[in-house]
Every structure is written in structure tokens, then in C-alpha cells.
Design a protein with these regions (language model features):
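Glycine/proline-rich, positively charged
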Residues: 126-198
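N-terminal binding-site loop/beta-alpha segment at the start of enzyme catalytic domains
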Residues: 1-121, 164
Length: 198
């Protein structure tokens, strides 16, 4: 199930008092204001306490249908909170999945909360030993763009969000890899990612 023109248009019609708040683009009706879930200072323990759930629900009930997150935000906690909020809204019949435009991103390595004692061991066990990537595919100890890693990362996002599909999946700061790969190899890498996801 993905966002549809009919459903996103129907969602926008629930808020007739919002003049010029919605825009049609690529056969979907988006709220001009979206909900993002990035949080700075990732190593502070209080950043991992669930506190977005009610905010996500209130944003959607107030007319926002564009939700943006990433697999690495708060080590997956942001996606998990959105997933809880969506499940509650779906059960209340407050919104349908097709009315929402859900976006996530892949590229940065999504360590899991609680933060592993040794992130390098986590990367070795979960990414390298599972053949999602080789050590040399990982830039700055935190960014990976192999097609297999990104497919795995996307599946983790779907699981965290509790949905079967994403409407938009972004490559998260792919330019990080240009210095290491060079421009021509970088473009070939992007092409291989698109082929994997088509």
C-alpha cells in the first residue's frame, strides 16, 4: 500500500480551512509542511526516550501528510516512534496509509539503540560478516552505499515504521562517497543502486 492521488487529495479535503497548504506534485497531494524526526547530539541518553509519538499523531491529525525520517536517526528510534504513532492512528481510523507520504533514507549505518559497546564490532558482525558490504565500502566509519546494504537498510526502515512500502526512499548524503570513489565510479555506484531498487 502506497500513497495515492485520490487518498492524498481526500486527506487534504479534510482541512478546507488551510488555504494553499497543499500542493499537487507527481500525482500526489503533499502538505507544504512536513514532519521531520532528526535530533542532534546523538549520544545523549535522553534522545532515545520515546517522546515523538504524540507529536507525530498531532501533526497528522492537524493536516500534515508528509513524514520524513531516516534509518539512522536516533539509531532507529525515530522510525520506531513513527511506527507506533501510525499504528495507533490506523487503529483509530484517523488516517489511512494511502493518505500519507512516508519517506526514509539509507546510507548512514544504522547502529541500534542502545548504542553498541563497540560500534566497529557491530558493523563487522551485522554488515561485513553478512556480506552486505566490505570494509572498504564503508566511508568515514559510518556511510555505506552498496546496493545490498541499502536494500537491508530499507527493509529495516519498513520494519521500524510498521509499513509494507515507502513512498520515497532517499540516498542519504551520497556525496560523502565522491572523494573516496571518484566521480565516474560514484555515478556507476548510484546506477547500481537504482537497478537494485527498480
Amino acid at each position: 500500500m502506497i500513497a495515492t492521488l485520490e487518498a492524498t487529495y481526500s486527506f487534504a479535503k479534510k482541512f478546507p480551512h488551510y488555504k494553499d497548504f497543499y500542493i499537487k506534485h507527481n500525482d500526489l497531494v503533499f502538505s507544504k509542511l512536513g514532519l521531520g524526526t532528526f535530533n542532534k547530539e546523538p549520544y545523549k541518553e535522553e534522545n532515545y526516550v520515546f517522546h515523538y509519538i504524540e507529536g507525530v499523531k498531532e501533526a497528522i491529525k492537524s493536516g500534515i501528510n508528509l513524514i520524513d525520517t531516516a534509518s539512522n536517526y536516533r539509531y532507529g528510534q525515530s522510525e520506531k516512534e513513527i511506527g507506533i504513532a501510525l499504528e495507533e492512528l490506523f487503529q483509530e481510523n484517523s488516517v489511512k496509509r494511502e493518505e500519507l507520504i512516508i519517506c526514509s533514507k539509507g546510507g548512514f549505518i544504522q547502529l541500534e539503540f542502545p548504542f553498541p559497546k563497540n560500534p566497529y564490532t557491530w558493523i563487522e558482525e551485522n554488515i561485513i560478516n553478512t556480506s552486505l558490504a566490505k570494509l572498504e565500502d564503508i566511508e568515514l566509519d559510518q556511510h555505506c552505499m552498496t546496493p545490498d546494504y541499502l536494500e537491508w537498510s530499507c527493509k529495516q526502515s519498513l520494519k521500524n515504521l510498521g509499513v509494507k512500502t515507502l513512498d520515497i526512499y532517499f540516498l542519504h548524503n551520497p556525496e560523502i562517497q565522491i572523494g573516496k570513489l571518484g566521480y565516474k565510479i560514484f555515478l556507476k555506484k548510484i546506477e547500481s543502486i537504482f537497478k537494485k531498487f527498480e
